[in-house]
Amino acid sequence: MLLEYHTYHPINLRSGILRRNLSASDSDRLNQHVGGYRLEVVEPLRKIRMVLEETEGLAADLTWEGSFEVVQEQRHVMRQGTRVTLDAQRFAQVGTWSGSLSVDGEEIAVSPDTWVGTRDRSWGIRPVGEAEPAGRPADFDGMWWLYVPMRFEDYAIVVIMQEDGDGIRTLNDCTRVWKDGRV
């Protein structure tokens, strides 16, 4: 299952060969409640709850809890000439899910011993979403992106790498965080 919380709010659920998509939308990014879909911060940087009231045969009451402290990834800056095209940073965290899902009335138990997940939150300037400023648009020559958060018994590792279209590494970060918060 993929849960995303952006300006748009898609929920994607796949069961066997069936895939269901549900979107709720509101342009107010501070509003964590759209229709029957809401996100609650139970404990900052540790625990969140996602509730979907029955909508088109889907319902959920899920709690995500971080297994480790958040990992703050290094700042990522890309330029094209003197123009900054990307200046962003994020935090990532691995954890587990608990609660229940309902698909067309069938209840699915979600247990933290088998439902592992990750979350991240990024901020900054990115070449997506908003219109290009006036002037010549930046050329895009492609990129390679690797983002791998991993959870183990005693620690988590978050790997993030990016190369531009010429194969030049523009981001190279790997962080291990232990259960006691050591990095």
Indicate residue ranges for each PLM-predicted region:
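Structured soluble/peripheral alpha/beta segments that form catalytic or ligand/cofactor-binding pockets
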Residues: M1-V183
